[in-house]
């Protein structure tokens, strides 16, 4: 083994979405950082769909941005369609989704990484960790190099013992055309970490020149497109439509006939697949009464003919893929440019992590992304950002940054992982959050930018813009409370459909009415037009939903009280009377840090929590 002549403070293994955020956070916080990837042409690669955001995922992207992460800025620079989803529903579940130019996104993120001071990007495959006692001190690569670092972040994606399946053929790979990472997961298991097996998949890529777009329904983006990042003034990339079609009974018949050559249905694949992003084979078999499934045709970029058919992920043989695709309207003469495939890979049971994403067994070793059992670029990037921040805090002996369930979707996700673990690829949903009315996209900066500035990831310039926005919210609320309409404002009363106002009403009182929005009030007083649109939107939400918001804050206060009751890390649960054997085993396995976390462990009953509460308060 040859030692590399330079020591690092933070080493990040894997330059996908988690690894890029972890390495950038570490370097921007002033630490000498190394980012290693199997292949430098695959930095920030979008392995599956060419899109960022979506339901709950858009919230994660806004939170990453509010903390000072990079993903939002890169998609704003390279996005080719932006849409707000759930516009007819409440503000808690509205979300932004952007189609990406896949190559442009990858190239842009790599440029950001390469231009970041204190960050070295190198090619290499890590096979082992270097340990000093119970503490990590570096990594070894398959080509015989040893890199030393005070903290290590593993963000290996789907590469650990990756195995690709196309029909009944299978071969090692971490992604199509790229080798897997061999040796590392076996090494982690040797060190005592529990390693499991998961599966995911991707559809074929289609030749756009062989698609009959006249038979498809176009789906256009918002005009004007709304950026993800607070740093982006406006989207400047050309915008393009997606197209919608659907499978039919003939499609489903061909798929059923091909199941004897499906690795999924012939017992070849052992890993558990994603429940909420099933393959088209799974959809047909799990929902036999459904005679059609939507297919969204998404362009892979402005400079390519490749099209991503969202909704038909598959590992069937290429000839079956082509046959079923050609039964779909608009795809009768389609050609496949790359076949779809399934991939199995190793992951580490996230119950073995602290809320900081540091492993409980090995000090200064952090895990983020799909290695923790999650799926999705956004989930990975969010974990990478937090792991990067906490890796720096660990080597500086600072307390870890742990976001609460009431503070961020990132906090909900990490708490779910380290408290409950996962046996299938974990995906973020708004329904996973108890306090989702407090965790909206529009107030992500309000919730997290102060923390981002505190840890050193939000610039002073951006902090000043944020404080100016907060001042405008206060001023806007004050104006709406003081400005009143009276019976003399006959034109305004008539246009708003109000009855004669004897005692007058403030604009806040009027805005609380369900049929009136803040734009309706602009003609009442043109000073409202001077308030920025994003501030007006936030004022409207906070005023219209303030009763519900107040109730959620009351719930949060009760929740926080239980979170403040700490549980010693070395607590022995075996002698505690009243706890069942099952509860003791679960508490011993998870080792919750506080009473609130203990209460969220599946199988830990309210009675058991009450016993723990009495014991902890007594001691």
Swiss-Prot record:
GO terms for biological process: tRNA methylation; tRNA wobble uridine modification. Keywords: Cytoplasm, FAD, Flavoprotein, NAD, tRNA processing. Its cofactor is FAD. It is found in: Cytoplasm. FAD binds at residues 14-19, 126, 181, 370. It comes from the Bacteria. GO terms for cellular component: cytosol. NAD(+) binds at residues 273-287. InterPro entries: FAD/NAD-bd_sf, GIDA_C_N, MnmG, MnmG-rel, MnmG-rel_CS, MnmG_C, MnmG_C_subdom, MnmG_C_subdom_sf. Its main location: cytoplasm. GO terms for molecular function: flavin adenine dinucleotide binding. PANTHER family: GLUCOSE INHIBITED DIVISION PROTEIN A (PTHR11806), PROTEIN MTO1 HOMOLOG, MITOCHONDRIAL (PTHR11806:SF0). NAD-binding protein involved in the addition of a carboxymethylaminomethyl (cmnm) group at the wobble position (U34) of certain tRNAs, forming tRNA-cmnm(5)s(2)U34. Belongs to the MnmG family. Homodimer. Heterotetramer of two MnmE and two MnmG subunits. This is tRNA uridine 5-carboxymethylaminomethyl modification enzyme MnmG. It comes from Syntrophotalea carbinolica (strain DSM 2380 / NBRC 103641 / GraBd1) (Pelobacter carbinolicus).
């Amino acid at each position: 083994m040859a030692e590399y002549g330079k020591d690092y403070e933070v080493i990040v293994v894997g330059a996908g979405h988690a690894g890029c955020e972890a390495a950038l956070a570490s370097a921007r916080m002033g630490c000498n950082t190394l980012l290693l990837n199997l292949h430098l042409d695959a930095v920030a690669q979008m392995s599956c769909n060419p899109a960022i955001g979506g339901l709950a995922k858009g919230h994660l992207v806004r939170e990453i941005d509010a903390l000072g992460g990079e993903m939002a800025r890169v998609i704003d620079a390279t996005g080719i369609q932006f849409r707000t989803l759930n516009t007819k529903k409440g503000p808690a579940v509205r979300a932004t989704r952007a189609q990406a130019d896949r190559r442009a996104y990858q190239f842009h993120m790599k440029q950001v990484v390469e231009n970041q001071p204190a960050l070295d990007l190198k090619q290499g495959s890590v096979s082992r960790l270097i340990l000093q006692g119970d503490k990590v001190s570096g990594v070894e690569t398959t080509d015989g190099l040893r890199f030393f670092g005070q903290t290590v972040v593993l963000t290996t994606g789907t590469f650990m013992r990756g195995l690709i399946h196309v029909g009944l053929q299978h071969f090692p790979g971490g992604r199509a055309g790229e080798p897997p990472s061999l040796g590392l997961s076996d090494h982690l298991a040797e060190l005592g970490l529990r390693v499991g097996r998961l599966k995911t998949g991707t559809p074929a890529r289609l030749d756009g020149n062989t698609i009959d777009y006249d038979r498809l329904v176009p789906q256009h983006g918002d005009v004007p497109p709304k950026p993800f990042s607070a740093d982006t003034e406006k989207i400047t990339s050309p915008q393009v439509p997606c197209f919608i079609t659907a499978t039919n009974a003939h499609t489903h018949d061909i798929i059923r006939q091909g199941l004897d050559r499906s690795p999924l249905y012939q017992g070849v694949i052992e890993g558990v697949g994603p429940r909420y992003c099933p393959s088209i084979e799974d959809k047909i078999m799990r929902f036999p009464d459904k005679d059609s499934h939507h297919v969204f045709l998404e362009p892979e970029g402005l400079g390519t003919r490749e099209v991503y058919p969202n909704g038909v992920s598959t590992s069937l043989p290429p000839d079956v893929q082509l046959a079923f695709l050609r039964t779909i309207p608009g795809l009768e003469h389609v050609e496949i440019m790359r076949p779809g495939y399934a991939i199995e890979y190793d992951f580490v049971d996230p119950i073995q992590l602290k809320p900081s994403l540091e492993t409980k067994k090995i000090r200064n070793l952090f895990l983020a992304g799909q290695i923790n059992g999650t799926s999705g670029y956004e989930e990975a990037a969010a974990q990478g950002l937090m792991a990067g921040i906490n890796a720096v805090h660990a080597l500086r002996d600072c307390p870890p940054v742990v976001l609460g369930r009431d503070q961020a979707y990132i906090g909900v996700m990490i708490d779910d992982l380290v408290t409950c673990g996962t046996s299938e690829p974990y995906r973020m949903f708004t329904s996973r959050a108890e306090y989702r009315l407090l965790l909206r996209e529009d107030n992500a900066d309000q919730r997290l930018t102060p923390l981002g500035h505190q840890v050193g990831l939000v610039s002073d310039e951006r902090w000043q813009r944020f404080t100016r926005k907060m001042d405008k919210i206060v001023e806007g609320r004050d104006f709406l409370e003081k400005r009143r309409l009276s019976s003399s404002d006959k034109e305004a009363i008539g246009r708003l459909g109000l009855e004669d106002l004897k005692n007058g009403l403030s604009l806040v009182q009027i805005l609380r009415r369900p049929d009136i929005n803040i734009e309706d009030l602009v003609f009442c007083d043109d000073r409202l037009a001077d308030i920025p649109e994003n501030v007006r939107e936030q004022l409207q939400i906070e005023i219209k939903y303030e009763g519900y918001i107040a109730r959620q804050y009351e719930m949060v206060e009760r929740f926080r009280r239980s979170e403040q009751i700490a549980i010693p890390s070395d607590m022995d649960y075996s002698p505690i009377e009243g706890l069942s054997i099952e509860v003791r085993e679960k508490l011993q396995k998870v080792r919750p840090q506080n009473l609130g976390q203990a209460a969220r462990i599946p199988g830990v009953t309210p009675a058991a929590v009450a016993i723990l509460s009495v014991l902890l308060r007594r001691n």
